[in-house]
Structures are given as structure tokens and as C-alpha cells.
Amino acid sequence: MAFVKISEQPSLYNDLEKKSVGEILHDINTEVEKAIPQIEKLVIEIVSRMRRGGRIFYMGAGTSGRLGVLDASEIPPTFGMDPSWVIGIIAGGDIALRNPVENAEDDTEQGWKDLQAFGINDRDTVIGIAASGTTPYVIGAIKTARAHGILTAAITSNPDAPISEAADIAIEMIVGPEYVTGSSRMKSGTGQKMICNMITTTVMIQMGRVKGNKMVNMQLSNAKLVDRGTRMVVEELGLPYDEAKRLLLLHGSVKEAVDAYRKQ
């Protein structure tokens, strides 16, 4: 039986140009709740590896690749982790973030070569993102990584997709046909970003990068974040604002500032 890409079937919606803004936004919204058991399984496996120095690699082409790079790029400022802990790789290289690279996603061997450039090992995790579930670049990387004993996962919008069969853990987010037929940057892309957020946020919490509900390890990269961090220190220690700010800037993070003060 031929594999059918549900995500590329004709849209269930018509006359889109006649809909109100509210109707469009409501129609596009997608639930990912059914994927939580598989996401949980993946997070548990990732955390056990990261505690031994493992990393997360996102692999994708086009929109899927861009979303992986985006999620990876948000880890250092949000959680204060070195960029080497979560890495996004897109078919065609960084130029493909802004411009399409012809045939890049069709190369079944380049994905593994791109992973090898980072010295990938069996403590790492490779997460392939492909709405269609058929992207050769991603599937090739997943298959080879798995053959080398590396944990692999797939995020796709189609059931029983080839990428799901290739990976150890398959996260299938069945959003159905896209609102605009075949435009996987929409429902599939939105769901992919949400799942990536869920994975890395939960991993970072488990790795101790959050306290309570606060980003106590965030990078102090602008005035807004310095102010936010200062107010966290004020709340935690009861210090005057100026003293809390001085302490924060001295130690570089909310966590370090609070720990240093309490050790005095």
C-alpha cells in the first residue's frame, strides 16, 4: 500500500479569503496532546544522556530545519547553556535559513556528514523533523545515527511515515491536511515548534536550569533582562533594587548571585 502524506492532501477548509481573522486563527490552532507520551519517553532518555555530557541535535530541511535551529538558538539566552548543548542543523547549511538550497534535502548521506563534523557520539540524541516524514536528508542521518548506537527520534505530521520507522522514538502529530494545501509551515510547523519547546524546556528544567518558574540562568544580554534578573534577586533575598543589581552584574546570573550572597 502506497504511503499517503495526509499533510499534503487537499485542505479541509475552503474560501479562506472570505473568513474573518478570528475564524482563520481558530482553524489553524492544533492540539499536540496525543503526542505527550512519546515526548515524555524521549525527554527521559535525553536527560539521562545529557547528564553524561550528551547533546541534542535537531535535523531538518526547509521550514522543519529552520524550526530546529530556532529552538536551539533560544537555549543559551533562556537557560544560560553553552550553544554546544543543543544544535540545529539544516539541509544546505546556514545559507538555507534565508534562501532555498536546491536539492539539499534529497542527499541521503550529507546529514550524517554534518553530524560527524560535530564529533557526534552515543551520548548524543538526534531529533529528525520532517512534516512529510519522507525527507531523504533527515532519514539518512537518522538511520546512520541509529546504526551507530545513537538515540534517534522523529517529529512528523504523518502516521507510519518512513522517518518514524527509521527512528527509535516516533512523535507523530497528526494535524491532518494543511489549512493552505501542502503548506507545512502552518499547522505542521506550529506543532513542530510547540513540540521542540516542550522537549527542550522540560529537559532544561530537569537539568536544573530553572528554579520555581524562573529563568535563573538566563543571559543578561539587554536592559530588560538585567531588570528582570534584578527583580528576581530582590524577591529572593529581600535586598534593595540597586544592591540586587550590583550583585547580579557581579556574578552574572540570578542563581550565582543568590548562591554567593547566601554563602557570605
Regions found by a protein language model. Name each.
Residues 1-31:
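Cofactor-/ligand-binding subdomain signature composed of acidic, glycine-rich
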Residues 26-30, 88-99, 211, 226:
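Gly-rich Lys/Arg/Thr-decorated short loops/hinges at beta-loop-alpha junctions or inter-strand turns
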Residues 37, 41, 136, 190, ...:
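Charged, alpha-helix-enriched surfaces in structured cytosolic catalytic cores
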Residues 203-264:
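Short, amphipathic alpha-helical interaction segments embedded in low-complexity terminal/linker regions
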Residues 21-25, 108, 192, 196, ...:
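A general structural signal for well-ordered alpha-helical segments in protein cores
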Residues 54, 150, 239:
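Short glycine/serine/threonine/alanine-rich loop segments
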Residues 57-194, 203-207:
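Glycine-rich phosphate-binding loops that contact phosphosugars or nucleotide phosphates
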Residues 34-49:
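A short, well-structured juxtamembrane/interface segment
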